[in-house]
Structures are given as C-alpha cells and as structure tokens.
Amino acid sequence: MELSVAMCGLLCLLFSQAVPMCVPTDYTLYEERRECDFCVAINTTICMGFCYSRDSNMKELAGPRFLIQRGCTYDQVEYRTVILPGCPLHANPLFTYPVALSCHCGTCNTDSDECAHKASSGDGARCSKPLRHIYHTLA
C-alpha cells in the first residue's frame, strides 16, 4: 500500500512538470489618479503560471530549434470599465482594465499585451489616498 502511494506521488510530481500550469488567477489592481480623491482596488483575473521554455547557451551551434521562449499569456480577454469615485468634473473618471477569461502558453503579443514584468517596490504601500474597493462580476 505504501509503495503504491509513493509511486502515485512520484508520478504526479513528474507529470506536473510536463503539464503547463498557466491559468487565470485572482489579482488586485490599484489605480490612483492625482486629480481624484481615492485610490481604487479592483479585483480581476490575470494569466499566471508556468510554461515550458528552453534556451541553449550555444545558440550559434544549436540553431533556433533549441530556443523556445513561451510565457503565460491571454487566450481570451475581456476589457471592463469602471467609474473611479471622487474625481472632479474636469477629470476623466473612466478606467479600463483586462479580465483574463482563459490563458495559454505562447509568445506575448506586444501589440495588445503588456509583456514586461514590472517589479513592485516591496514596501507594501499601494496607495497614498483612502482606498475604495471595486469588485467585478462575470457576466
């Protein structure tokens, strides 16, 4: 019995490395505009996870077939717009954000997606103004 449990665990561990783990994941966006009174927290989904990549350190000898660079990116995305509270009449209170409906492993489309990772400051401060939450619901 113990051997079958250990074998099953080992197979699951090995198989999980071969299966891409690229899925929509809950994420909170923080939007703060200078002219508005509040910082807004918007709950949405983004694509996040592991995708198989390979990069040879001998590109000249190996050629492009040994260069596979894929990331977790949008397959289907929906854009939603919210009205930011506390904005004066002269300011545009609309903010549009993406909601990942499905994801896949592939190359990032720089024409439509943000492909660069932006490092956070790490201090935990996300807003300098009072915080308001906006929750999205799937239609």
From Swiss-Prot:
GO molecular-function term, one example from the UniProt record: hormone activity
Matching PROSITE patterns: GLYCO_HORMONE_BETA_1, GLYCO_HORMONE_BETA_2
Glycan-modified residues: N43
Compartment(s) of residence: Secreted
Record's signal peptide: 1-20
InterPro entries, sorted: Cystine-knot_cytokine, Glyco_hormone_CN, Gonadotropin_bsu, Gonadotropin_bsu_CS
Disulfide bonds: C22-C72, C36-C87, C39-C127, C47-C103, C51-C105, C108-C115
Transmembrane segments: none
Claim: Transmembrane is one of the keywords in the record: no
Similarity comment: family membership: Belongs to the glycoprotein hormones subunit beta family.
Protein name: Thyrotropin subunit beta
Source organism of this protein record: Salmo salar
